[in-house]
Structures are given as C-alpha cells and as structure tokens.
Amino acid sequence: MASKVSCLYVLTVVCWASALWYLSITRPTSSYTGSKPFSHLTVARKNFTFGNIRTRPINPHSFEFLINEPNKCEKNIPFLVILISTTHKEFDARQAIRETWGDENNFKGIKIATLFLLGKNADPVLNQMVEQESQIFHDIIVEDFIDSYHNLTLKTLMGMRWVATFCSKAKYVMKTDSDIFVNMDNLIYKLLKPSTKPRRRYFTGYVINGGPIRDVRSKWYMPRDLYPDSNYPPFCSGTGYIFSADVAELIYKTSLHTRLLHLEDVYVGLCLRKLGIHPFQNSGFNHWKMAYSLCRYRRVITVHQISPEEMHRIWNDMSSKKHLRC
C-alpha cells in the first residue's frame, strides 16, 4: 500500500510539473488576477464572480461540492480544523504545509484536520491534477464556483459550510492562506489550551480597524455603492484567524442573508457584527513578512509571505532546536 501511494505521489508530482510547464508556455497566467473591473467578470449562475453582486440582495450559496471529504471527522472529532485557502497551481505550497506545520500527526493525542479550499478552475487540466492530488491526500475540498481573487469570500464560506455540515463537533477552526507559516506549538498550547474548557462565540486574530479604499487601482478597492459606509466593523486579517467551531455555522447562516463583499476578511467582520461577536486582538498573529530568527518566531503564531522552501527551512530549524533557550 505504501509503495502504491509513493508511486501515485511521484506520478502526481511529475504530472504537476509537466502541466504547469505546458500552461506557462501556452496560456496566460493572469486570467483571474482580480485586475478587471467588476462588470467584466463572469455572471452565469454557477460560474458567477462578484461582477453581478450589486443585483443580488442575498447569498444562497447554491454551489455543489466537486471534491469533498465528508468523513474526515467521523472516526475522531478534531480539536482543531485548519482551513487553508489555496489555488490550483500551488501544489508545492500545499505539499510544504503537509510536511511541516499542517501535518495532522504532529501532536499525539490532539486530533487536527487540515483541509485545502479551492474553487473550480477554467482550465480542465488543472482541475484534473487537483482531483488526482485529492485522491492521494484526501485533504482538499472544491465547490463549483470559479476560483478567483474576487471569489475568496465564497471560498471561506465553503469552509464554514463544511465545518457546520461535516465537523460541527470540532472545538476550534483556523482559517489561513497557503503562504502562511503557523507556529503550531504556540497556537495549540498557549492560545487554545486543550486542557481547558472550549470557548464559545470566540474569534481572534490580527484585528484591523479601518475603512474602505475608494481608489479603483487598489487591490482592496471597495465601490461606494457596494459599501457606502466610511468605516468597516472590526475584522481579523484573512491571513490567519481562529474561532470556536460554533461560529462556523453562525457565520455561514448569517451570510445567507448578508450582501456579499469580495473582501473576505471584511465580509466575515460584517457577519460577526450582525452576530454580536467581537473579535479579540492577539499580537501573535502577523499579517506581514518577518525575517526569520529562532527566538523571534518562537513568540508568534502566524507569519505571512513564506515560500515553500522557507517553510521547510523554518520548520526544520525550529524542530531541531526546541532544546535551545532564547
């Protein structure tokens, strides 16, 4: 069995490399960069992006799972579910996470479930590669919306829906991105503390208090007619936040009656405000890149903009030097 899995893994890696090389020379890589104005985005019911959001007063989230892991929480209820937003071409990033901080077997006696979140790609080759990857690792879920920057909110809501439907008895959930390094020791033992009673209606991360950017050239541009207020409610940076599992269902159900926004973290903040849940500030969450040093990284929970190579290097260094004092 092990040799079969190894062969499948090697085959998948080779196929990924071949496919990505082919795509790089035959297709543009900026199909879904989010640089186009809203009016140019696809508007078909199953394939819509946020171009038609102004005419949609509610969000029915009528998408189907193309890839699912409905039994992932069946045998053992996880203490923590990790939802990682990723894109089809980021195989190396997913594999780096599987082999480092996202390894579900890192903590004896503490069940962790790691899942990568994806939409549907316009390229059937990439969809097929992700399906093969899923058959090997069983840690990917996909719904049939177009995977794009402007649909990150749908991706997060898919994760919330999955937890509420298939893993509602978990204690905590983390939502993060594929270029984030997570100090799991700090997250598990210093923040969540498995020996204590699980919290309810709990939400924490790097809290941002700000308002909409009206410059159309900005990545975070927010049209006035989509969000007319001058301030956002407090929200946690989408690079990484933690919440009690009961909040997943609360946010998902609230989203069904809350006008969608393309800025995922802002939208989650809007849902929290409706629910009367105030996100707590935690200085361990960083939404920027930070130069590596052993002692510095021992004090944090998340660090942004980490490449797969850096992920391995940081993990190996921290794992081999646990006996050293700072």
UniProtKB/Swiss-Prot annotation:
Catalytic activity, as annotated: an N-acetyl-beta-D-glucosaminyl derivative + UDP-alpha-D-galactose = a beta-D-galactosyl-(1->3)-N-acetyl-beta-D-glucosaminyl derivative + UDP + H(+); a beta-D-GlcNAc-(1->3)-beta-D-Gal-(1->4)-beta-D-Glc-(1<->1)-Cer(d18:1(4E)) + UDP-alpha-D-galactose = a beta-D-Gal-(1->3)-beta-D-GlcNAc-(1->3)-beta-D-Gal-(1->4)-beta-D-Glc-(1<->1')-Cer(d18:1(4E)) + UDP + H(+)
Transmembrane regions: 7-26
Topological domains annotated Lumenal: 27-326
UniProt keyword list: Glycoprotein, Glycosyltransferase, Golgi apparatus, Lipid metabolism, Manganese, Membrane, Signal-anchor, Transferase, Transmembrane, Transmembrane helix
InterPro entries reported for this sequence: Glyco_trans_31, Nucleotide-diphossugar_trans
Domain of life: Eukaryota
Enzyme class label: transferase
Membrane-related topology note: Single-pass type II membrane protein
SUPFAM superfamilies the record matches: Nucleotide-diphospho-sugar transferases
Cofactor dependency: Mn(2+)
Entry EC number(s): 2.4.1.86
MF (Gene Ontology): N-acetyl-beta-D-glucosaminide beta-(1,3)-galactosyltransferase activity
Principal location class: Golgi
Species in which this protein is naturally found: Mus musculus (Mouse)
Cytoplasmic face of the membrane: 1-6
Stated family: Belongs to the glycosyltransferase 31 family.
Gene Ontology annotations for the cellular component aspect, listed alphabetically: Golgi membrane
Functional note: Beta-1,3-galactosyltransferase that transfers galactose from UDP-alpha-D-galactose to substrates with a terminal beta-N-acetylglucosamine (beta-GlcNAc) residue. Involved in the biosynthesis of the carbohydrate moieties of glycolipids and glycoproteins.
Pfam family, one: Galactosyl_T
Location within or outside the cell: Golgi apparatus membrane
GO BP terms, alphabetized: galactosylceramide biosynthetic process; lipid glycosylation; oligosaccharide biosynthetic process; protein glycosylation
Glycosylation sites: 47, 151
Name of the protein in its database record: Beta-1,3-galactosyltransferase 1
